[in-house]
Amino acid sequence: MRVFIIKANEAHTANDFSLKDLPGTSGRIDLICRALNSAFHLSHSFRKNVRVYVTLLGPPDPPKSLRFEGPELKPKILNPDELSTAKIIGKALERGKDIKRKSTEEIKVLPGIYVSNMSFEDVIRVVIKRFPLYILEEDGKDITEVEFPKNNVAFVLGDHIGLSSEDLSFLESVGMKVSIGPKAYLTSHVIAYVNIYLDRLGIP
């Protein structure tokens, strides 16, 4: 299983955005839609070996964490169309209003899609119980020089704003920084690259 954890610094935590202007009204949920596309979709098939967590930290009710579970997801629900994915995120945020403030319980929204009030650190602590953690940063160890385990791997990365120094201090205490290159790449492109690289290594 491959896990991707995305910190979405400004992504809205309520279904209050316009589908006609996702970049301008949602805190860049459009970037999250593209990242999900890169995580799960192949040209003619769907990756069932991927799990994605997205922690949304924008207004009005942060944090909200979404979990997309590849083995349970149906391609017809999470399809490559950006607007339909944004609608699903909006639906999840609507359901998230039912969760008690300090609870970390997850609510199932659709097959393979869950919402919770977990913080970014909560998500990390859940993941590292079962997965070695790799932090995708430009100044990390070259990914081609890293010896990955043969089954479960987890990667954490930021959105267009990135990870803060406080985030990195915490993450480096529980994981290892790795890099796909010397420049800041789009979140969706980084996920696509990592998936392709793990495919080449034969890591499920």
Curated annotation (Swiss-Prot):
Its EC number is 2.1.1.257. One of its GO terms (molecular function) is tRNA methyltransferase activity. It comes from the Archaea. GO terms for biological process: tRNA methylation. It is an enzyme of class 2 (transferase). The keyword Nuclease does not apply. Belongs to the methyltransferase superfamily. TrmY family. HAMAP family: tRNA_methyltr_TrmY. This is tRNA (pseudouridine(54)-N(1))-methyltransferase. The gene is trmY.
